[in-house]
Curated annotation (Swiss-Prot):
This is 2-(3-amino-3-carboxypropyl)histidine synthase subunit 2-2. GO terms for cellular component: 2-(3-amino-3-carboxypropyl)histidine synthase complex; cytoplasm. Pfam families: Diphthamide_syn. Binds 1 [4Fe-4S] cluster per subunit. The cluster facilitates the reduction of the catalytic iron-sulfur cluster in the DPH1 subunit.
Amino acid sequence: MTSETVIAPSLSTAQNDGTFTYDKVKSTAKERKHLNLKNPSDANEIKSKIWNYYSLSELIQYLGQKENDDFKYKRITLQFPDNLICDSATIVHELQRELNIVPQANQDTGESNTAQRVWILADTSYSACCVDEVAAEHVRSDLVVHFGDACLNEIDKLQAVFVLGKPTLDVDAIVKQIKTAYSTEQKVVLMSDAPHTYLLPEIAKQLPDYDILIADLPKTSRAKIIGYTPPPTGHKKFNRVFNTDTVEFGKYELFHITSPESPRLLQLTTNFASVTTYDPISGTVSTGPFPNLMRRYKYVHQARMAGTVGILVNTLSLANTKVLLNTIKEKIKEAGKKHYIFVVGKPNVAKLANFESVDIWCILGCDHQGIIIDQINEYYKPIVTPYELLLGLSDELSWTGKWVVDYKSVLEEYGNEVIQQNEDPDTDEDLPPVFDPVTGRYVSTSKPLRQINHLMVTSSEQGGVDDHDNQLVKRFSNAVAIKGTVSTSAIHLQNRHWTGLGSDYTEDENAAGALVEDGRKGIARGYDI
């Protein structure tokens, strides 16, 4: 018998430090292009740039206001977009130092306190350009300080302060691009995102021979803009103020500094003679391609034929959101269609694909970033705006080509319109056949609520036990109802070939099922059969 060492069998692959390679953080320095730092590792330079970029002196003076010897704003929330969150820690430290705020643990005892407290909000529930009232209400905030680009829409409840920042621009390069793109006979509107707006007057001064109209920031009732003074009066349009009484925008060329998001860009291209965007980083201009308006006209017709409308709430902070939501619900009901309301945070393809019964989506969101413009058919169902939906539900479909996203304008145009209904809803014979103008097919489910009086809801046994309690959907005469109301989701589930686990067998099959047998035992390396 040999004395060789017995080696136990290896149960897994040998591993050491060289088996796997992990990514390691080589540097903790944060890239802050917006600050134009000469030495990114110099803490003093970073602090000085942050004070100047965000106008912290004016912000601290505003936050330090008092009423009756007490702070006016005690629970302050700071909202940062993703590209500015790197400055949040420094800003909070400076605010705490200047306002004598003592850092506290994130515990709310509910007791009244005369001291100020500061929270940081990041990863907003909806569009980053909107004030996140939902997150602010979690700590019962009485003031939201919004940093970075903002849509400046009227907000619903809370007081807000906008700190847009002071980015730099190569003014001479922009003036050169404008002179190259336009002649002195053309009328030009200068517009930009909110942070770059303070530089527009300087650009206009270098173009004395041009007919230039500047788009200033508007004055809002529940918010203040730090480092910027909006004009008191003017013609308000596109969330901007123009220093004139009336403007025929169709006669103006638009030169926009920075490239807007698709909803904003579509809105601008439908109102100006032409649109040219300028990229401050690369210094290049673009004249297209831009979102197509003809596709929106197709979606209006699809909204007219849709039987089930999903109302997708993509904001809860804008003013008139609840009023518009109630108006849309009433118009959908008057048109004989079914609606469902969804609040899913930030929408994406996977979230909306879970609701197959929805024929079309109507999104309530900010006109800058909160509206989904599906240019590549990424989503399974069309997505329309409230204006497009109400236009499709109206009795006479007449579109002038304008694209309206402002809540107030939509309510003024369609809020008082009454959708006509048949005098006798009990007779289907008077209803004309409906054909889809896109596909040409006959549509029998465009108005499911018109059939509500024909429902014959019956039960297999009154007061007894249902033999088919494993079925989610009960079949009725012509439709499906849940709690006395038509459910198009249940109808859709009923018409599917496969309706879920447990529905793929009938009474004729063996209810006892198969016998349970012993399976394999052991580990994955070797099973005992």
